[in-house]
Amino acid sequence: MTIHIDFLDETNEVTAEQIETIERLLAEAAALENVPDGAEVSVTFVDNERIRAMNRDYRGKDAPTDVLSFALEEEGEEEVHIVGADMPPVLGDIVISIPKAKEQAAAYGHSFMRELGFLAVHGFLHLLGYDHGTEEEERVMFAKQEDILARFGLTR
């Protein structure tokens, strides 16, 4: 099971060790969710100004947020699914605010790595179609997140 992850750190604040941990977390999540071999995802680390602009432009919310996910494989109601010849899926993009992650880690009383891992896994599950719009959806999604994080010792 291999997932290809492209990382871009626009903040120059994320260490190689932290990126490696996120890579392992997302590979574990992909394996647990039976993501096709060779699937691709990008993870970009940004500052609050950049994520605020993205949140405003794409969600109509003019405020910084912690993580945004942009799924590339979603089909609209009138779109037809075209099956490629064994083409691995491009799942989409995850954008994480490093200042927000640091702020939330301090507020929740856990490590920056735990918060960074949580946001990466949270964004990844959104790319796979999970949501938390209802209590039941939230229960399922958050249980999956906690399970994956616990496997790496990233508990609260």
From Swiss-Prot:
GO terms for molecular function: metalloendopeptidase activity; RNA endonuclease activity; zinc ion binding. Binds 1 zinc ion. It comes from the Bacteria. It is found in: Cytoplasm. Belongs to the endoribonuclease YbeY family. Its EC number is 3.1.-.-. The lineage of its organism: Bacteria, Bacillati, Bacillota, Bacilli, Bacillales. Pfam families: YbeY (PF02130). This is Endoribonuclease YbeY. NCBIfam families: rRNA maturation RNase YbeY (TIGR00043). Zn(2+) binds at residues 122, 126, 132. One of its GO terms (cellular component) is cytoplasm. Single strand-specific metallo-endoribonuclease involved in late-stage 70S ribosome quality control and in maturation of the 3' terminus of the 16S rRNA. GO terms for biological process: rRNA processing. Its cofactor is Zn(2+). The keyword Thylakoid does not apply.
